[in-house]
């Protein structure tokens, strides 16, 4: 329903694949039938706004559960990218005894720039709630991405856990 505060799943109808070969459970989760209509649910979380448009929140696989709250990695990445020194960033969860997972950002800075963590977090804090801010910022010389430009969350998580 437009304007509802709830978060839902992006889904589509039409020409839908039959499913995953040999994986009935995954097929049922990704391609459910609801009231006789078959859907594809790729894992994107969304919110429908009052004007009927859809706000894409992020991939469910990149959602971080921290302190009982869900944090969409893409939302935090966009907030960090608002700082002019940040060229690229990837946000992941890192195991934490206190938080379950804590938000950690791997950031690539513009050559010659060296803002403090406090400066980066202050800018990001203007765009997202404080509980979503990274508990740690890790700097890298070059971000690892797939040939199509997708974030390599596995690499970023390894950086975060190894730090």
PLM regions: where:
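AMP-binding/adenylate-forming catalytic core of the ANL superfamily
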Residues: 3-4, 8, 18-19, 29-30, ...
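Hydrophobic residues in beta-strands and at strand termini
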Residues: 12, 109, 139-140
